[in-house]
Amino acid sequence: MKGLPPSLRSRKRYIAFRIIAEKKIDERSLSRALSEKMLSLFGECFAASGLRLEAFDGERGIVRCYREALDKVMVALTLMTHVGGVRVIPLTLGVSGTIKRCKRKYLEV
């Protein structure tokens, strides 16, 4: 069975972000907190967002989602206040269509 042609596939977007936290947080707890925030804000329809934490180094990271859900994911990311019991302030750095461009433009120092 053949896959979908590129013109029919869902487009992905990559959101670069920075987390200011009182203590170090790990990738798993951040991913869980973001999923829980999406679920509480938008209900079960967040499953169609294609949400995935691509990279996180303790302070900066990249979240992948489908283009149609970009606004919802950015809202959920912005409204997060706690991750695993640690108070956080998430800052969105920018959005890109590829991981490579996202890293080069927003995450390199």
Swiss-Prot record:
An annotated GO BP: tRNA 5'-leader removal
GO molecular function terms noted in the UniProt entry: ribonuclease P activity
Assigned keywords, A-Z: Cytoplasm, Endonuclease, Hydrolase, Nuclease, tRNA processing
An example Gene Ontology CC term for this record: cytoplasm
Keyword Nuclease attributed: yes
Protein localization: Cytoplasm
Gene3D superfamilies: Ribonuclease P, Pop5 subunit (3.30.70.3250)
Listed EC numbers: 3.1.26.5
Record has Nucleotide-binding as a keyword: no
Catalytic activity from the UniProt record: Endonucleolytic cleavage of RNA, removing 5'-extranucleotides from tRNA precursor
Function statement: Part of ribonuclease P, a protein complex that generates mature tRNA molecules by cleaving their 5'-ends.
Name recorded for this polypeptide: Ribonuclease P protein component 2
Organism: Archaeoglobus fulgidus (strain ATCC 49558 / DSM 4304 / JCM 9628 / NBRC 100126 / VC-16)
Biological classification of the source: Archaea, Methanobacteriati, Methanobacteriota, Archaeoglobi, Archaeoglobales
